[in-house]
Each structure stands twice: as C-alpha cells, then as structure tokens.
Amino acid sequence: MAFASEDNVYHSSNAVYRAPSNHQEADQEALLGKLLDYPAPGLQRPEDRFNGAYIIFFCLGIGGLLPWNFFVTAKEYWAYKLRNCSSPASGEDPEDMDILNYFESYLAVASTVPSLLFLVANFLLVNRVQVHVRVLASLSVSLAIFVVMIVLVKVDTSSWTRGFFSLTIACMAIISSSSTIFNSSVYGLTGSFPMRNAQALISGGAMGGTVSAVALLVDLAASSDVRDSTLAFFLMAAVFLGLCMGLYLLLSQLEYARYYMRPVAPVRVFSGEDNPSQDAPSASSVAPASRVMHTPPLGPILKKTASLGFCAVSLYFVTAFIIPAISTNIQSMHKGTGSPWTSKFFVPLTVFLLFNFADLCGRQVTAWIQVPGPRSKLLPGLVVSRFCLVPLFLLCNYQPRSHLTKVLFQSDIYPVLFTCLLGLSNGYLSTLVLIYGPKIVPRELAEATSVVMLFYMSVGLMLGSACAALLEHFI
C-alpha cells in the first residue's frame, strides 16, 4: 500500500501517516498530541510518570537561554565596567561613549552572527555526533565562560576598558555558539517526542528570561554594590547550568524518554524520488550505521517549512529589532523625580521582567490552544502585523535621540502596553511556528528540521539586531 504524496504526509512521534485531504482537518489532527503519537508495532507507549520528562524539558529550556538572558539583563553592570571604574563621572572620550551607548547592539550582533554559523554546523553534525555529546559539551563550554565572567566581576578593569569590552564580546560569541548547539540539539530531540514536550522546552526558554529578570530586580534591591549583585547573578547562572547537565543525564534514564529516543530507520518517502510502501521497516527498527545518511536532505526540508520559515524570520526580526537595543533605551518620562521606580528599576521592570513574563504567558497558552494551524494563511498575516510595533516603540521616550525629536507617547503606560503586546505575540506565535516545523516531516528528519527552524529564527534575530544597530545612529 503506497504512502500519500509528500504534501499530504504528516509526522507522528513514531510514524508517518496519510493526512486528511481537508487542510483544516489536517491542521487539527496535526495538533492533537495523542493522535500524533501512534505507538510502533510491538511496542507499548509508556506514560510520562509524574510529568518527569515534561519538567526536565522545561528546565532545559530555562538553561538553554539563561546564559544569554543573564548577559543581556546585566545592563547596570556593563555600564559600570565600561566606564572608568574608579571615576565613572569623569569625561570619557567619544569612542568610549560610543561603546557605552550602543553596547546592547554590539552584544546582540555578537550573539546572533555566531549563532547562525553554529546552527549550520549543528545541521551538519546531526548524524555525525551523538546528541548527548553535543548537549554536554555545549553546557560545559557555557559553564566555563561563566566561571571566567565571575572572576572578572571583582577585577578592576578601569585601565583596560576597551580590552574588557573586546573580551566581553568574545565571551558573548562563545556563549551564543554553545547555547545554539545546546538549544538546537535538545529542540531537535523533542521532535521525536509528543508535541507537549517541545512546548515545555520553548516555554522554559521564556521562564529563563523571567527568572533572570526577577533575579536582577532582587539583586538591585538587596545590594548597593553593582559588582556584588552581578556576582550573585552570574553564580546563579553557573549553578543552573550544572543542574541542567544533571537533568539531561537523568532524562535518558526515564523509560518514557528511552522509548522516544530509540533509533529510527531511514524513510525514503522524503527523498522526492518515489514513495515507499507501508510495508517498509517500521520506525522502531534500528538502522544499520552504514545506511544512515551523514547529512540530512536540506532541499525537501526547506520546501516543507518555507511558510513557517518566513514566519520565524519575521517574528524574530521584529523582536530582535526592538529588544534589547531599542527598548532598553526608553526612559521614564519622570526620570528626574528621583524615584528609583522611574530610574533604577524602570528598564528591568518594563523591559526585561514584563517582556519575559508576557512571552512566558503567550507560550503557555499554546499548551491548550493551537490556532491558527500550520497551513492557515492567518498565521503569516498575524506575524506580519507585528511590524507595526517598531514605530510605536520609536515614538516613545527613546534616549538619546538626535534626529527624531518628537516623542509622541508622553506617558510611561505606553511602553508598558507595547511591551506586553510584543511579549504575548512573540511567545504565542513563535511557539506555534517552532512546534509545527518538526511535525510536518517524517520522524527521522525531525531533528534536522528542528535545526532548520532554529536557523530561520537566528536569521531573523541577526537581521533584526543588525538593523537596530544601524537605526540607532539615525534616531
């Protein structure tokens, strides 16, 4: 019995099956975790006891983005270190002020460009290096970089500010590269699991941002010395990275996880040449090593994910364009009143905490609601509508500004509302896009497709951060 054509094939956790001809019906079925999870012949599907795998993936999601979030949210620390530490009020030369004013943009570019390159590398390594090697190695590198940053917290860098800046950018590039390998490897792993596990991982990423924002606020409130608060900040990140290593090792011991992590035989239906019969080897059979392709077929994956890829690029372009380069430079209209809520805590509250919490809420909603579907024209329409948020943020009290002198929204409530809308839309729509991608291809291509989806995401982040860095000089 022949398989359906490529356009009508959907991926379950363990098999490929003929999708209904009606697109709306197909979308609904593709989103039902239970229906997508057909057990292979001869194997009984185990239950996720006590939601152990779900919790582990959620924690791994936190750990995957925690290093980046901790780097970005430590704004006061970077401002302190990039000035003359012993005399912050002294006159800096124009080059030092340029580094200080546009540091967030430099940091964003340093994180997105290496991320893009290492996503390509990870795509090539999918079938060459085992996933547990990639995960543990990337976590170890991130942990080592944070140890270096912890040591530098207490080092007086006032005599080599530019050298410290270069070292920080290099550390950010390494952190971004290792985090990319970790995130894409774990996200690819969830492609073989039911959809709820991918949702847990993606929601965990938003929780990582929320945790870092809360930790920053607590540190700022509890410590008068920015170095002490940052030391506690970075130590927390290092401890959690170590915890992630332990949790990942624990994951492979769960019966539920072992069931979905077992090897899969190659399926020829996706080659574009012919359609195999359903009598081909089942998904549970183990493929001989000599038959496993070293590099997944990129062309068919790009074809199947073209629409979702456009959505991913557009979504993250807008988000990276606004955060952190634009949003962190929006000041309270009442900054001069002397209140800490309109000065010291304004950016941590209205940008980092609010955005990450709204992002988390948007991602959690996808655990119960998954509309529009992967074939719906409404999905790209909603994504494109987010471009309207860019001018709204620019017309808030962004400082410094030399050319665009008009501040249209002269109330602090506007950046709060815009940030909520940005976070909710980013969380909900990006989660839908990322969990759809690996589910519209055969299971053995799920990990490679996950890497491709993250590649789309990184392209959007890189373009957004680069455009924001350019735009800042014209505002």
Swiss-Prot record:
According to its UniProt entry, the protein's GO biological process terms are:
adenosine transport; cytidine transport; dopamine transport; guanine transmembrane transport; inosine transport; norepinephrine transport; nucleobase transport; nucleoside transmembrane transport
Summary of the function given for this chain in its UniProt record? Uniporter that mediates the facilitative transport of nucleoside across lysosomal and mitochondrial membranes. Functions as a non-electrogenic Na(+)-independent transporter. Substrate transport is pH-dependent and enhanced under acidic condition, probably reflecting the location of the transporter in acidic intracellular compartments. Proton is not a cotransporting ion but most likely change the ionization state of the transporter which dictates transport-permissible/impermissible conformation for nucleoside translocation.
Q: Which residues carry this modification: Phosphoserine?
A: 21
In terms of Pfam families, this protein maps to: Nucleoside_tran
What family name appears in the similarity comment?
Answer: Belongs to the SLC29A/ENT transporter (TC 2.A.57) family.
State what the entry records as the consequence of deleting this gene: Knockout mice show lysosomal nucleoside buildup, elevated intralysosomal pH, altered macrophage function, and develop spontaneous and progressive macrophage-dominated histiocytosis.
Q: Which residues form a coiled coil?
A: none
Important for acidic pH-dependent nucleoside transporter activity. Acts as a pH sensor (site feature) positions? 219, 447
**Protein name stated in the entry:** Equilibrative nucleoside transporter 3
Major subcellular site? membrane
Q: Pinpoint motif Dileucine internalization motif by residue range.
A: 31-32
Q: Name one GO cellular component term.
A: mitochondrial membrane
